[in-house]
Amino acid sequence: MFTINAEVRKEQGKGASRRLRAANKFPAIIYGGKEAPLAVELDHDKVMNMQVKAEFYSEVLTIVVDGKEIKVKAQDVQRHPYKPKLLHIDFVRA
């Protein structure tokens, strides 16, 4: 079981996403279920180490946002074309 700590995004848009990536974080979104979509920011290095394992894409993950645990599955992962960097992940509530 993977547990990822996340923070709610305060800013959105291209410039805000670029600033996140420069700070070694990246944007993600949690959607699905009856709740509204939630934009979050994740630590790049921690998630990069987790996503190397195949289970990251098939098992239910736990994302902790403001002390609240959300069960999710990775739906879509966007990567940089040639650098080993994650650009964005879509999570769907499990």
Curated annotation (Swiss-Prot):
Gene Ontology BP annotations: translation
Xref: SUPFAM superfamilies: Ribosomal protein L25-like (SSF50715)
Domain of life: Bacteria
Pfam families xref list: Ribosomal_L25p (PF01386)
GO cellular component terms, A-Z: cytosolic large ribosomal subunit
InterPro entries reported for this sequence: Rbsml_bL25/Gln-tRNA_synth_N (IPR020056), Ribosomal_bL25/Gln-tRNA_synth (IPR011035), Ribosomal_bL25_short (IPR020055), Ribosomal_L25_dom (IPR029751), Ribosomal_uL5_bac-type (IPR020930)
UniProt KW keywords: Ribonucleoprotein, Ribosomal protein, RNA-binding, rRNA-binding
Any one Gene Ontology molecular-function term assigned to this protein's record: 5S rRNA binding
Similarity-based family: Belongs to the bacterial ribosomal protein bL25 family.
Subunit text: Part of the 50S ribosomal subunit; part of the 5S rRNA/L5/L18/L25 subcomplex. Contacts the 5S rRNA. Binds to the 5S rRNA independently of L5 and L18.
Summary of the function given for this chain in its UniProt record: This is one of the proteins that binds to the 5S RNA in the ribosome where it forms part of the central protuberance.
Entry protein name: Large ribosomal subunit protein bL25
Species this protein is from: Escherichia coli O45:K1 (strain S88 / ExPEC)
